[in-house]
Amino acid sequence: KKYMIRGNHDYWWASANKMRNLMGDAITFLQGHGTAELIQTEEGPRIIAFGGTRAYLCPGDSHFTPETDQSIYDRELMRTEAALQEMNKAVEILREEITAEAKVDITKLNKADTTDSDKAYPSAIDIDSIPVTKILLLHYPPFNESNAPSGFTDLIEQYKVDTCIFGHLHDQISFNRIPKEFGSTKLELVSADYLDFRLKEIM
């Protein structure tokens, strides 16, 4: 499954809805949106939640001009929070669906095994035992050139994002200054030239 966010040069990108209408289910376009899905891992089932938007230059960056950039920055903060809220909602809905399906399956199994008490199944699933991993996709890094806290890092901490993936940076100085973590959030720089144009395994 493929997830895509808008970059700073993607002028062809009209809107997430128009892109979805064009591509169908082949790609999930995230622009202030979030989603979640259940996957199977070697350790068992896990819920992966994705949210994303373009983000923007942060205040304090040498290229940030308040007169022209502040309103765009504020808008991208709203889109980021909308994506994180939608991620959380998608996780809740997925948990409800998993619980409902499990109850139906358990009911069928119990009816089939009414003659053998040793084969009785529990009436509910411990949905809270399924771990959730929250991944936020941004084009811009969530901080300025000094790696100073920003509105984006505030949201990352508030919504307990596990991994933040971003790009935009294409110079060695930036490559060297990016931290591996911000608080409890893992940071992944995935600019193509930084990765030598190779795929990056996140988890």
Where are these regions (language model features)?
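Divalent metal-coordination and catalytic microenvironments
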Residues: K2, G7, F50, H168, ...
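Binuclear metal-dependent hydrolase catalytic cores centered on His/Asp/Glu-rich metal-binding motifs
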Residues: G44-I127, K200-I202
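Active-site-proximal segments of metal-dependent phosphoesterases and phosphodiesterases across multiple
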Residues: L57-E67, R95, I125-V161
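Core catalytic region of metal-dependent phosphoesterases/phosphodiesterases
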Residues: K1-E43, S150-V161, V190-A192
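Active-site-proximal beta-strand elements of phosphoester/diester hydrolases
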Residues: I47-Y56, I135-L137, K186-A192
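Binuclear metal-dependent phosphoesterase catalytic core
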Residues: N17, E37-G44, S71, Q85, ...
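Active-site environment of divalent metal-dependent phosphoester hydrolases
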Residues: N8-A16, A36-E37, L57-D61, P141-P149, ...
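Short coil/turn segments at beta-strand junctions that form active-site/ligand-binding loops
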Residues: K1, R46, I130-T133
